[in-house]
Amino acid sequence: MTEDLSQLSFEDALAQLEEIVRQLEGGQLRLQDAIASYERGAALRRYCDTKLNEADARVQAIIQRADGALETKSMD
């Protein structure tokens, strides 16, 4: 679980987060393992939130030109 989050795709991070939630909800983890899983889950949630915000910004940057064509607005 020491994998660098920046190396994960959004989908992989979300899958890991979902698995952690299942394990925590199952109630079978030892206390130390549950705490470590909770910490990892919190980091994964922040990472996924950042990725979603980045994707939203890209979508919001798409504008429609006068001729109806779509273009990507520069984020600069």
UniProtKB/Swiss-Prot annotation:
Which Pfam families does this chain map to? Exonuc_VII_S
Give the EC number(s) listed in the UniProt record: 3.1.11.6
Chemical reaction(s) catalysed: Exonucleolytic cleavage in either 5'- to 3'- or 3'- to 5'-direction to yield nucleoside 5'-phosphates
Segments traversing the membrane: none
GO biological process terms held by the UniProt record? DNA catabolic process
Name where it's found.
Answer: Cytoplasm
Q: Which InterPro entries match?
A: Exonuc_VII_S, Exonuc_VII_ssu_sf
Q: What is its main location?
A: cytoplasm
Record keywords, A-Z = Cytoplasm, Exonuclease, Hydrolase, Nuclease
Gene Ontology CC annotations of this record: cytosol; exodeoxyribonuclease VII complex
Give the EC class as a word: hydrolase
Q: Name one GO molecular function term.
A: exodeoxyribonuclease VII activity
Member of which family?
Belongs to the XseB family.
**Entries under NCBIfam families matching the protein:** PRK00977.1-3, xseB
Q: Which PANTHER family match?
A: EXODEOXYRIBONUCLEASE 7 SMALL SUBUNIT
Q: How does it assemble?
A: Heterooligomer composed of large and small subunits.
Q: What is known about what this protein does?
A: Bidirectionally degrades single-stranded DNA into large acid-insoluble oligonucleotides, which are then degraded further into small acid-soluble oligonucleotides.
Q: What is the name listed in the Swiss-Prot or TrEMBL entry for this protein?
A: Exodeoxyribonuclease 7 small subunit
